Each structure stands twice: as structure tokens, then as C-alpha cells.
Amino acid sequence: AMKLNRPIKWIEDRRENFYATTQERTQVHNAEIAVSRDGRILGLKDDFLHDTGAYDPYGLTLPLNTQCHMMGPYRIDNFTSDCKVVFTNKQIATPVRGAGRPQGIFVIERLLDFAAKALDIDPVEIRRRNLLPPDAFPYDHKIIDQAFVPFVIDTGNYEPALNKAAEMIGFDHFVKEEQPRLRSEGKYVGIGITPFIETTGVGPYEGARVTVESSGKINIATGVGTQGQSHYTSFAQIAAEQLGVDVSDIHLITGDTGEFHWGTGTFASRGAVVAGNAIHAAASIVRGKILKLASKVLETPEEELELENGQVQVADLPRKSISLGELAGLANPLRGAVKPGTEPGLEATAYFGPQYGATAFGTHAMILEVDPETMMLEIKRYVAVEDCGVVLNPLVVEGQIHGGISMGIGNAYYEKLHFDENGQLLNASLADYLIPTASEMPPRIEIGHMETRSLNELGTKGVGEAGTIPVPALFAQAIENALYNRDIEILEMPLSPNRLFEILNEENSI
């Protein structure tokens, strides 16, 4: 398009897309955990291979994410991990929702499940005993994260999230009363519970420009791009709160270098954290300019003024006011003299670059039933307790969680690229590549919110990938629990009805 200086239309069929698109998730781990007799983690060792495909466009982003999340929300004083990035003749590996994190959580959660079984400790209790305490933060894990800076968890309060998920799913009641009754009726029902963390809001920076126009409308320009994450809603809310206007009075431009030169991008659950804080900072500066000018015009101290409904008004005398549009005009005098150093207009540009990311966390729990004949699953209940810091918009957050869980279900039990020994893709169509539909989703996702502020000004953390990260480990735990009388160990994801049938037959043949 740039060479021809004209729009280009690209068309490819589904098979071409399967062959030419990117892939992610394939890793092979050899992991060991050392625990005391009371279930305390003493050490974790892991060596793994990471399949990067034909070449490596993202460096070590994915395996570093895996290594950092392999410690989960737990205190692990002794940790070693060695990774080899392997080139194969498959599609290239790029970050996909979760981006190496689900694999790390899968490793530590599976090891804890095996330890709990060997020590005869309740699966919730063994996790509770190893969680990092609230006074441990900021917690430096002494390893390098995807940005090649120390992996520091800024804030956390993990035990209440675990307890809340266990309470919402009715963990103890199910295990002691419901599950024995259902099993006596011949039903294979299982329960799982999985804590997790998600590094979000990574650098290097984002910027924003906020301008009050003479119409009273607010223009915002930011370099971050958007692909449907409701940035327009969230960013408008951030500015509207600072400037005392309705979100409908805000016009937002994203990802246009003609409007704003500098930006990094939408990835790693960073939009609301990094760009959001840049917008907040710019809007705060503009708010200060508004109050300073209005104080002069209204002859009232700034601390006695308030911004509301597009007006600046005296707190105890609301009829004494001036509109933002009028102030914007006064801030841009066309004649006369101004004091040296005066900046025209009600406008500001600000940037935000975090020292380290904002680490979200949560706990998911699930009850499912396995059909012993077909190995099809039915999710009976699904609970997601999420802590993404200060929630800007609950509907946006819940939409992200729902979408993430849907993708996690696909990662856990349906979606897998099958290759033959020559690297030929065997299921390059939606007739053969399984994806979850509405029928495979839980009838209802019960969401519990917690709000542990992060260290940035807004107190926000990302949530775009949180729904996906714990799901594979959660499925493995719940399926094993459902098939309690078969004594299987699930060591891989994704599964499928066919693959689960094969695993059961492999166990029976031993």
C-alpha cells in the first residue's frame, strides 16, 4: 500500500490462514518441586523447550513470561529454570492472549496438585500455606521479566481471593456433601481451584494530549492503538472524571501518528494502565490550568471551585460560574499582551512509563462433569475472582473476563494444531480444528471483584488476559478429580475428548 500509494485488499481462505498465521503455547517441561512434610514449597526446578516456529520475531518474551509466572502467587525461595528456544518448521510463535503465562501457571499448579495428593493435604490448604503475604510487597523475585528488568510484583493480597473463590464455589460443601452423593449416583463430577498472577501494564511508555476546545468539548489524542478493548469508553471516563464533563463530550483519537507521534502499542494488558495513566496525567494538568484561569476570572480561590457539567463554579454559589468553552476562549487571547511564560490554550501533553508492571491476580474455581462414554465435558459452575486494581468500568472488565475464559476453555480442551512427523499441518480447517461454542461455555460465569490498588496514580492493573491464564491448570485439576477412580495424572494441555480417552486407555494398559 505504501509503495503503490493506494489501499490494498488482501484475501485468504481459511486454510491459507491456518498455514500462514501464528501459533503459541507449545512447550515441553521437565519440572520438579521440593516440599516439606507440611506442604511448604522448598524449591522449584524446571527445564523446558519452547517452540518458536520457523523464526523468532519476539525474542524471549514468551519463555520469560513462562518463567516468571511459574512461581505464581507463591513464596519460592529456591528457583531455577533453564529454557531452550527451539526452531521448528511450524508457523512462527507470537504472543497470544496469555502469552506464555498459562504454561507457567500450569506447571506450578500441577506440581502443587501432585504434592497435595502425595501428602494428603487439602488442595486449597496447600496453596494457602504458600501464598505470599500482603506485607511482602513490592516483592522482587530476583529474576528477569519480559522487559529484561527485574520481575517485581508491586502489590498483592492473595489469600482473600483464594478464600472468596472457595466460598463462592462452595468448595468444602461440594467435597463433603454434594460430590459423594453425585458419585453414588454414578456421575463423574470434579472440582478445581487455581490461583494465578498476571503481569500487566509493562513499559516502556505511552503518551496523551488533552485539549479543551472553545466549544467546551474535550479532544484526546494518544499513540496507543485499539482493537476493540473498549479503550474509547475507559479513556473517556478517566478524562471526564478529571474535567467534570460527560463522556459524550469527549472525542478520542488513538493510534494516529498524524495526531500523536509517540506510542508503543496495545499488548500485555497495558492499555488502561499505561495509556490510561498518561491520559490521567495530561487531564490533571489541564484541570490545574482550568482552575487557575477560572480563579482569576471568577475572583475566587482555586480551592473553592469545582468542575461539574462542563462548568467551573463556586462551590457554595453555583450560579457564579463559567463554562469550559468560555475559559478555552479566554486562554487563547488573539490580541493584547500576556505575562512572559504564559502558555496559550487549555492543553497538556503527558507521558507515563512505569518502573515495573502492575501485577494482577485472582483465583478461578470450577465444577464439571465428565461423560465416561464420550469424554465430553459439561461445566456446571464457574467462579472467577479477579483483582485488577481499581475497576474503571465493571462492564468492560467483566467482558474481558468472559472473553478470556472462553479462550482459556479452548486452550484447555479443544484447540490444538496437529502436525505429522514432517511438520505438515493436518487440521487446517474449522471442520477439524475444535473451538468452543456457546454450548461448551458455562451456563453462567460468577465473577467476584477485589480491588487492591497498584502503585500507579490510577491504581489500575490490566485484565485483558486474566480470564485465560488459569484455565488449563484448572481443567486438569477438575478432570482428575472427576475421574478419581481412574488414578490418572494429566501432564499436558490442550486435551480433547479423544485425547482424554487415549490417556485413560494408556493408564488401563499399564
What are these regions (language model features)?
Residues 1-160, 167, 172-510:
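Cofactor-binding beta-sheet edge motifs in enzyme active sites
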